[in-house]
A protein has these predicted regions:
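Conserved PLP-anchoring active-site segment centered on the Schiff-base-forming lysine
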Residues: 64-83
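Conserved glycine-rich beta-strand-loop-beta hairpin in the small C-terminal domain of fold type I
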Residues: 261-273, 283-298, 333
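N-terminal small-domain helix-loop-helix segment of the aminotransferase-like
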Residues: 1-53, 60, 110-111, 248-253, ...
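PLP-dependent enzyme catalytic core of the Aspartate aminotransferase-like
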Residues: 31, 42, 191-192, 304-305, ...
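Conserved core segment of the aminotransferase class I/II
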Residues: 119, 182-266, 270-276, 358-360, ...
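Active-site phosphate-binding strand-loop segment of PLP-dependent enzymes
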Residues: 95, 100-176
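Helix C-cap/helix->beta junction micro-motif
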Residues: 156-157, 279, 319, 363
Length: 366
């Protein structure tokens, strides 16, 4: 099962593990999280709580921070899985922060206050704001000033800030990404810092969704303590931890992997965005992730949810391309679609773009 060069044997893997996670793996994970952020932030291994993926991490944090019928504010468009992860078992509500293309879907103070007031008017207690940075489905990062404003808002409202940074190692224009950890590093007030919690996973940056490895990193002692007590429901196997601790501790490998992965993502992103542009289709400027945010609003016969889904159905059945309609992400504008481009060959991408070009040519003839 394992080699003889210091790797753990079957017995060591099979016995009960530390529910907090193996120290070696938490140390390796902390170092890797620092590495993908360019060393701009420091992570304490003792503040890392392991979970079976980011899904479990987000749900666990929701259980800790909120009670049934409380709410989290989430900017739109957002990852459709949040409707499951944050709501199904916790009984917590999602109140959308409506963002639009007028400022590239960045969160504005007005939209934030409006969402908070909507919840208050409905007698719903708001317990926090949850963002994804970089964003899924936008493929864009949250500006530093927006992060600072978000934290100020959370302090004023006495609520929490959760930053899901699952794509933080897949930023192909690294200078554009600011982790909330960088904001916290410059804050001395513990009462402010302890409102911030980060979710991370190896599913996207290392392409290991089947390994089910996620983390909660909290600046709150109480949240760390509570998350550890509850983490027995979402443990990561000893074998997985040992293997990944060894892999992540190989700094030469991780540095090369991050560099090559970012370069490949950048090239792939530029290929698809340029290809779509030649077909007359514009995309939101992106800098991270495995997808682009494509605007087909000009093709809608009706500027409605049904109109968007009708176009999606045509693309699915005629072009045999499965893209995600913006309505599934609760987008406030109709006609936006998420296009995933990473998990396919160059040849497959070329075929997809060819079909899109032919589709657009047919549309122009009508």
């Amino acid at each position: 099962m394992w080699g003889s060069k210091g790797a753990p044997g079957f017995r060591e893997n099979a016995l009960f593990q530390d529910y907090h996670g193996l120290k070696t793996f938490r140390q390796a994970m902390a170092s890797f999280m620092e590495q993908i952020r360019g060393g701009k932030s420091r992570f304490d291994p003792d503040r890392i709580v392991l979970t079976a993926g980011a899904t479990a991490a987000n749900e666990l944090l929701t259980f800790i921070l909120a009670d049934p019928n409380d709410a989290l504010l989430v900017p739109t468009p957002y990852y459709p899985g949040f409707d499951r992860d944050l709501r199904w078992r916790t009984g917590v509500k999602i109140v959308p922060i409506h963002c639009d293309s007028s400022n590239n879907f960045q969160i504005t103070p007005e939209a934030l206050e409006s969402a908070y007031q909507t919840a208050r008017d409905a007698n719903i207690r708001v317990r926090g704001v949850l963002i994804t940075n970089p964003s899924n489905p936008l493929g864009a990062t949250v500006q530093k000033k927006v992060l600072e404003d978000l934290l100020d808002f959370c302090v004023r409202k006495n609520i929490h800030l959760v930053s899901d940074e699952i794509y933080s190692g897949s930023v192909f224009h690294a200078s554009e990404f600011t982790s909330v950890a960088e904001i916290v590093e410059n804050i001395d007030d513990v009462s402010v810092k302890e409102r911030v919690h980060i979710v991370y996973s190896l599913s996207k940056d290392l392409g290991l969704p089947g390994f089910r490895v996620g983390t909660i990193y909290s600046y709150s002692d109480n949240v760390v303590k509570t998350a550890r007590r509850m983490s027995s429901f979402t443990l990561v196997s000893s074998q997985t931890q040992h293997m990944l601790a060894s892999m992540l501790s190989d700094v030469e490998f991780t540095e090369n992997y991050i560099r090559i992965n970012r370069e490949r993502l950048r090239r792939r992103y530029e290929t698809i965005v340029e290809g779509l542009k030649k077909a007359g289709i514009e995309c939101l400027k992106g800098s991270a992730g495995l997808f682009c945010w494509m605007n087909l609003g000009f093709l809608l016969e009706k500027k409605t949810k049904d109109g968007e889904l009708q176009l999606w159905d045509v693309i699915l059945k005629e072009l045999k391309l499965n893209i995600s309609p913006g309505t599934s992400c609760h987008c406030s504008e109709f006609g936006w679609f998420r296009v995933c481009f990473a998990n396919m060959s160059e040849n497959t991408l070329e075929i997809a773009l060819k079909r899109i070009h032919e589709f657009m040519d047919r549309r122009r003839k009508f």
